[in-house]
Amino acid sequence: MKYERTFKTIVAVGVIGTLLATVSSMTWADDNAEAKPLALRKIMQDLGKNMQVITDGISREDWELVAKIAPLVADHPQPPLGEKMRILSFVGTDAGKFKGYDEKTHQAAQALGQAATRQDGPAVISAFAKLQNSCLACHQGFRKPFLEHFYDKR
């Protein structure tokens, strides 16, 4: 009877230890998964490249190029749903502000493309300024906290 109780205790401790080890290794794996770049990072890098192409097009008055690239900025890809939920959860009460910047960027890039299609240089410059301002405002409000939270960069 005494040995049976000791055996059950040893088995119970072994099972609990195994479960704890499994859970802690899963948590560690999740922490590493969070350190992987978000899809948002690739989206932002592509947006940056497209903005450089637009800047080049404007400087050369290549309105066809600007009109071609502006929709890539206006209708940029969205992060996968799970990532989007993580991002919105992180921004919390600023989610409306974050979405607002995205909408302003969308509208300004659409206006930029339309102005370029009309070959209206002053309207292109005005729309591009609005686009740059919406990008800058979002970056100033969210870039540093994102890097700290999602990439542990301080």
Segments the model singles out, each with a brief description of its role:
Residues 17-21:
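Alpha-helical transmembrane segments
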Residues 30-60, 64-154:
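Sequence context surrounding c-type heme c attachment/ligation sites in exported
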Residues 2-15:
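Bacterial N-terminal signal peptides that target proteins for export
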